[in-house]
Amino acid sequence: MINLKLIETNFDEFNKKLIAKNVKNDVLSTLLEAYDELKKDRLELENLQNLQNTKSKEFGEIMRQKGDAGELKKELSINKSKIQTQSEIVKAAEIKLDKIASCVPNIIDDDVPFGADENENVCIKKILQPPVFDFQPKEHFELGEKLGWLDFERGVKLSGSRFTAIKGMGAKLNLAIINYMIDFNQSRGFELVNLPFLVKDEILFGTGQLPKFKDDLYKVDNDELSLYLIPTSEVTATNFYNGEILSEDELPVKFTSYSHCFRKEAGSAGKDTRGMIRQHQFEKVELVSITKPEDSDKMFDEMVSCASDLLKSLGLAHRQMMLCSGDLGFSAAKTIDLEVWLPGQNTYREISSISNCRDFQARRAKIRYKDKNGKNRLVNTLNGSSLAVGRTLVAIMENYQQKDGSIKIPKVLEEYL
């Protein structure tokens, strides 16, 4: 969640940044009104508690002197009832504030360009030149069906739309891609973690998926358990230290994690209906870092380089895009997307998103560290795909396709097959 004390002293600046993130103009005002109400209620409770303490001392002194404390006893009883009532008022004010604050997105960094949507994202640089073909390149779904790698019809038969069956050499290549990504990320100092695919509500709250994006999540709900399927292993890797206080010496934490991801893709009707670009179930290899606040910018650059170098090692042309304010995710203060060239579509498509969430997720998940002076401080959290597995398979198929419809295997993957 956002820092309410900081917002209070920089209202106009932060309100402008939230509006740039397509948040309604009155949201921040409503949030601060609820915050002021809570502070007022807490002050009233504190005053009543102080009065109770003072009166209790007076009562004790009178009793020691064996005096008449009848009236004072009545006052203490009345004030105790007031404290109970005021405590309930404070609790209700806290719930009201949390409900509002939990749906307010992170504040954008100063260097994030203002813009309405993805059309106003800014290209930072392009890496490698797209391949030139002496024939009309095909899209991955046409190549995959012809080779017997991708079976969309049976994927639909098994699970419905936006599910794909991968088989034969396609499945082997998919597995090779995963193992290569994990090895590459480990070579950059990221520790491999294997984490659950089902999580509790509070874990999704920690990374910002709940409560705002509940409709895009799959839930397993029965008599035995009530858990959500993860939309990304960012959720589990970031929350690994949920509610904990780390020592400064433990930072930075650098995780890489492979997982299946599950998303309803609400609002994407009609988009990418053919092929593997947009699926309800897909695979990713994720990077997650937990750092001191002063180190997160350097870590952000390191994570962007890791994912970009991974694409480069596969010989895949791509570009780095700075997301504008209107295209940023809920928890992100800053994001760079990596978009890979797909010759079959004759365009660049997102294959990785690297985000710095500052202390936004840490505040929600209560992840802190104890600094050298013994003070507990919030960490910064960062996450990014390195890479989306299915889209990497798509990119290899389209970029390495031959005139006869066969697919050449990138050299770095040969030992993994």
UniProtKB/Swiss-Prot annotation:
Which GO MF terms are attached to this record? ATP binding; serine-tRNA ligase activity
- Provide this UniProt record's keywords sorted from A to Z: Aminoacyl-tRNA synthetase, ATP-binding, Cytoplasm, Ligase, Nucleotide-binding, Protein biosynthesis
Annotated GO biological processes are: selenocysteine biosynthetic process; seryl-tRNA aminoacylation
- Positions of disulphide bridges: none
Location comes to:
Cytoplasm
Identify the main location: cytoplasm
- Residue sites binding L-serine per the record: 232-234, 286, 385
Reaction(s) catalyzed by this protein? tRNA(Ser) + L-serine + ATP = L-seryl-tRNA(Ser) + AMP + diphosphate + H(+); tRNA(Sec) + L-serine + ATP = L-seryl-tRNA(Sec) + AMP + diphosphate + H(+)
The record's top EC class is: ligase
Q: Tell me which InterPro entries the record gives.
A: aa-tRNA-synt_IIb, aa-tRNA-synth_II, aa-tRNA-synth_II/BPL/LPL, Ser-tRNA-ligase_type_1, Ser-tRNA-synth_1_N, SerRS_1_N_sf, SerRS_core, tRNA-bd_arm
Q: Name one Pfam family in it.
A: Seryl_tRNA_N
GO CC terms of this entry: cytoplasm
**Residues annotated for ATP binding in this entry:** 263-265, 350-353
Q: In which pathway does it act?
A: Aminoacyl-tRNA biosynthesis; selenocysteinyl-tRNA(Sec) biosynthesis; L-seryl-tRNA(Sec) from L-serine and tRNA(Sec): step 1/1
Quote the CDD domains the UniProt record gives.
SerRS_core
- Tell me the function of this protein: Catalyzes the attachment of serine to tRNA(Ser). Is also able to aminoacylate tRNA(Sec) with serine, to form the misacylated tRNA L-seryl-tRNA(Sec), which will be further converted into selenocysteinyl-tRNA(Sec).
Domains (record comment): Consists of two distinct domains, a catalytic core and a N-terminal extension that is involved in tRNA binding.
> What family classification does the UniProt entry report for this protein?
Belongs to the class-II aminoacyl-tRNA synthetase family. Type-1 seryl-tRNA synthetase subfamily.
Instruction: Summarize the subunit comment.
Output: Homodimer. The tRNA molecule binds across the dimer.
Q: List the protein's name.
A: Serine--tRNA ligase
- Name the source organism: Campylobacter hominis (strain ATCC BAA-381 / DSM 21671 / CCUG 45161 / LMG 19568 / NCTC 13146 / CH001A)
Q: What is the lineage of its organism?
A: Bacteria, Pseudomonadati, Campylobacterota, Epsilonproteobacteria, Campylobacterales
Q: What is the gene called?
A: serS
